[in-house]
């Protein structure tokens, strides 16, 4: 097994950070108020360490799980954890396999990893995989005993499975101290890097530092031979604006059964990216929509945009309890030629699906539905796009599925992310919207009793009417006789 740990030091120097370093131990302590951001990447070859796993899940070509507990921890400016908060799962079958076998194996693998049961009906199809989303993040339950590592509680992680190997990345933020030790069976490569601001730009980051190798199979007894001074450049796929001001706020405008997702943009801090490699840019709005809500693609496209993606159940008439899929995936595109074209407001009107009456004795006539915030970003084609996946931190090197909106863009696209405000008016949560949907107030027993009583009364009325007619007919015949 291989472990590659990259430590990003936001300070201007590495002086005083390394507290111990030898062939078996590496300890670091951050500068006060300049805490580390760390990516741990574990690579396990399944054909050698778990030969039975490939045959057990032979119908699965690829499976990817991306979980985000904290929306603010995306790894900017180096690491790529820019997927949607909550749980995102992607699955691809092998060619020419039985569909039932594939879904049984997917269900079994997800139960093993997450402890949740997903049926095939809960997924939707996107451009290159099946996709499942839930606002509730899920930790990996347990890892194999032979792997000798565990993920940190509630760390954002990215799990990739295919027939040859398993890759797990996790992101740790605000780390003040960390220690690494030589372990049997694990090849460890630990990198400590800072960004050299003197020669770095937003589109070309220069990383400078050292790499330390901890490997029991190493033949060297010399500490210096395990330490490698390193400097390299990366062209980041995910970028941020120079101004760190929070620039989008999304809230719900109540409108009965037709609520509006209203996003306000601080256009004074949003400009067309001017990085050296940038060519054409467009503005995008991405949203995972709960199945209790309907998007009408014929009437409710936000002003100034065009609908690019609408994956999921598009039936506008079905009630919520008839929808098996988790919801819909939406992507809108706004064209703009200059800074004045950037929209000040984006309003997306959705409609509520009919909800089952609450089967309890509550007096509430409202269902509370939680939905993810929209992801708003600027996507740009760049020159020398082939350099993007040369970065060791670019996930497209390992897998082509997943990443939510990423799969709908070409390989030469970079993303400038607009941060959501914490002051969203969303029940104290900066990552979720709360939508109130009216519904009936009763119980199923009461509905059944009233229905049965109504039918009984109807039958009695019919019988009464028939008996009256028979009686009147008999009386009339008697009088004639």
Swiss-Prot record:
Keywords: Endoplasmic reticulum, Glycoprotein, GPI-anchor biosynthesis, Membrane, Transmembrane, Transmembrane helix. Residues 1-451 are lumenal. One of its GO terms (cellular component) is endoplasmic reticulum membrane. The chain crosses the membrane at residues 452-472. Residues 473-481 are cytoplasmic. GO terms for biological process: GPI anchor biosynthetic process. It is found in: Endoplasmic reticulum membrane. InterPro entries: Pbn1, PIG-X/PBN1. The keyword Transmembrane helix applies. It comes from the Eukaryota. The keyword Transmembrane helix applies. Pathway: Glycolipid biosynthesis; glycosylphosphatidylinositol-anchor biosynthesis. Belongs to the PIGX family. This is Protein PBN1. It comes from Candida albicans (strain SC5314 / ATCC MYA-2876) (Yeast).
């Amino acid at each position: 097994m291989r472990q590659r740990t990259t430590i990003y030091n936001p300070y201007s120097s590495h002086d005083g950070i390394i507290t111990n370093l030898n062939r078996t131990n590496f300890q670091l302590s951050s500068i006060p108020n300049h805490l580390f951001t760390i990516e741990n990447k574990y690579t396990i070859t399944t054909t050698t360490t778990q030969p039975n796993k490939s045959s057990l899940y032979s119908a699965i070509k690829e499976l990817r799980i991306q979980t985000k507990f904290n929306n603010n921890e995306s790894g900017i400016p180096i690491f790529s954890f820019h997927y949607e908060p909550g749980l995102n799962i992607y699955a691809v079958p092998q060619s020419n396999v039985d569909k039932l076998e594939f879904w049984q194996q997917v269900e079994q693998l997800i139960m093993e990893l997450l402890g949740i049961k997903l049926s095939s009906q809960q997924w939707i199809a996107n451009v290159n995989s099946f996709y499942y989303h839930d606002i509730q993040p899920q930790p990996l339950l347990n890892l194999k005993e032979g792997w000798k590592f565990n993920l940190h509680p509630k760390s954002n992680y990215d799990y990739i499975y295919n027939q040859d190997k398993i890759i797990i990345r996790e992101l740790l933020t605000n780390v003040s101290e960390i220690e690494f030790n030589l372990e049997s069976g694990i090849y460890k490569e630990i990198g400590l890097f800072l960004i050299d601001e003197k020669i770095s730009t937003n589109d070309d980051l220069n990383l400078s530092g050292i790499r330390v190798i901890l490997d029991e199979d190493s033949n060297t007894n010399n500490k210096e031979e395990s330490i490698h001074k390193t400097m390299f450049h990366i062209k980041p796929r995910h970028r941020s604006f120079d101004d760190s001001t929070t620039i989008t706020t999304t809230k719900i405008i109540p409108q009965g059964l037709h609520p509006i997702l209203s996003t306000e943009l601080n256009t004074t801090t949003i400009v067309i990216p001017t990085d050296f490699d940038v060519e054409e840019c467009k503005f995008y709005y991405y949203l995972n929509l709960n199945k209790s809500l309907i998007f009408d693609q014929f009437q409710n496209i936000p002003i100034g945009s065009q609908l690019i993606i609408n994956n999921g159940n598009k039936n506008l008439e079905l009630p919520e309890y008839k929808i098996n899929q988790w919801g819909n995936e939406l992507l809108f595109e706004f064209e703009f030629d200059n800074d004045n074209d950037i929209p000040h407001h984006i309003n997306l009107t959705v409609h509520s699906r009919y909800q089952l009456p609450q089967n309890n004795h509550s007096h509430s006539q409202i269902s509370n539905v939680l939905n993810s915030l929209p992801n708003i970003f600027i996507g740009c084609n760049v020159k020398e796009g082939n350099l993007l996946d040369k970065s060791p931190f670019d996930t497209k090197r390992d897998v082509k599925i997943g990443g939510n909106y990423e799969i709908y863009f070409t390989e030469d696209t970079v993303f400038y992310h607009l941060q959501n405000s914490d002051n969203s008016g969303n029940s104290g949560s900066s990552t979720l919207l709360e939508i109130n949907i009216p519904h009936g107030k009763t119980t199923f027993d009461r509905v059944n009793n009233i229905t049965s009583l109504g039918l009984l009364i109807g039958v009695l009325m019919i019988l009464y009417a028939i008996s009256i007619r028979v009686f009147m007919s008999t009386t009339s015949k008697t009088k004639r006789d």
